[in-house]
UniProtKB/Swiss-Prot annotation:
Family stated for the protein in its record: Belongs to the universal ribosomal protein uL15 family.
Keywords carried by this UniProt record: Ribonucleoprotein, Ribosomal protein, RNA-binding, rRNA-binding
Organism domain of life: Bacteria
Region (Disordered): 1-54
Role this protein plays: Binds to the 23S rRNA.
Protein name: Large ribosomal subunit protein uL15
Subunit structure: Part of the 50S ribosomal subunit.
A Gene Ontology term for the protein's cellular component: cytosolic large ribosomal subunit
Length: 147
């Protein structure tokens, strides 16, 4: 057996249809495009968002909302996370939180929230604190510093 002897399995190779090559071919004259109309023309494609000339849905619906570009987006950390990760008396900074993988990025700052309980006195330095987080940290003898 040689490489030149290899043939495809009978019926596995379909012959390409050549359109517009005479009426006898079965795909002559209109070449399978029917008569007239947009889809019979060259590049005659109707896009999926086209609604037949009526005002499209995205123009019928009202505009609403906006993006507040002055809004501060804080990376959020709860006091229960500080309890698990940091030792008693340790200083907690945004850089240490980033380093230990508590937050993925600092964004516009770090905000400490009061979800969970804390028993270790920590010095927490952050950009913002919720009132419950501030109260819980100071209740166990910790310090709160706003950057």
């Amino acid at each position: 057996m040689r490489l030149s002897d290899i043939k495809p399995t009978p019926g596995s190779m379909k012959k390409r249809t050549r359109v517009g090559r005479g009426i006898g071919s079965g795909k002559g004259k209109t070449s399978g495009k029917g008569h007239k109309g947009q889809k019979a023309r060259g590049r005659g494609k109707v896009h999926p968002w086209f609604e037949g000339g009526q005002t499209p849905l995205h123009r019928r619906l009202p505009k609403f909302g906006f993006k507040n570009f002055t809004k501060k987006v804080y990376s959020v950390v709860n006091v229960e996370q500080l309890e698990k990760i940091f030792e008693s008396g340790e200083e907690v900074t945004p850089e240490k939180l980033l380093e230990k993988g508590v937050i993925k990025k600092i964004n516009d700052g770090v905000k400490i929230l009061g979800n969970g309980e804390i028993t270790k006195p920590l010095t927490v330095i952050a950009h913002a604190f919720s009132s419950s987080a501030r109260r819980k940290i100071e209740a166990v003898g910790g310090k709160v510093e706003v950057i």
